[in-house]
Amino acid sequence: MALKAVCVLKGDGPVHGVIHFEQQQEGGPVVLKGFIEGLTKGDHGFHVHEFGDNTQGCTTAGAHFNPLSKKHGGPKDEERHVGDLGNVTADENGKADVDMKDSVISLSGKHSIIGRTMVVHEKQDDLGKGGNEESTKTGNAGSRLACGVIGIAP
């Protein structure tokens, strides 16, 4: 039976969206589908953060979900945080259609993202290749525009 989750993204500004997650079997890839609106045109960092705490907005979500204590990277890199999902790309209308698959995150087990926070960032994630210390932690993706806790879905 497939595992499903959903995340409603909201921020202090116009950025908002909904992301659906589906994993057909434990240990299998997770498919993410949805949309984010209100963005500036271009790429925006897209990560799962460690905590599901949004009591003070997106700032209390903690760092990227990184249970293996690795450096920041891109979604196809061996060296990456579990929560590193790269970028979403907004069109000239500020909408990013999300349709991706990731084999590192999970909806169950030790790498489960259930109860953690999904965040979309102000800037492009440099995938850990920016040449400075911040790049190896955050990808220089900038401020947190919108976030939401990932919850179990029917």
Curated annotation (Swiss-Prot):
Organism, as annotated: Equus caballus (Horse)
Subunit structure: Homodimer; non-disulfide-linked. Heterodimer with SOD1. The heterodimer CCS:SOD1 interacts with SLC31A1; this heterotrimer is Cu(1+)-mediated and its maintenance is regulated through SOD1 activation.
Modified residues (N-acetylalanine): 2
InterPro entries for the chain: SOD-like_Cu/Zn_dom_sf, SOD_Cu/Zn_/chaperone, SOD_Cu/Zn_BS, SOD_Cu_Zn_dom
Binding site for Zn(2+): 64, 72, 81, 84
Residue segments, region Disordered: 64-94
Function: Destroys radicals which are normally produced within the cells and which are toxic to biological systems.
Cofactor (UniProt): Cu cation; Zn(2+)
Annotated cofactor note: Binds 1 copper ion per subunit. Binds 1 zinc ion per subunit.
N6-succinyllysine: modified positions: 4, 10, 123, 137
Disulphide linkage map: 58-147
Main location: cytoplasm
UniProt name for this protein: Superoxide dismutase [Cu-Zn]
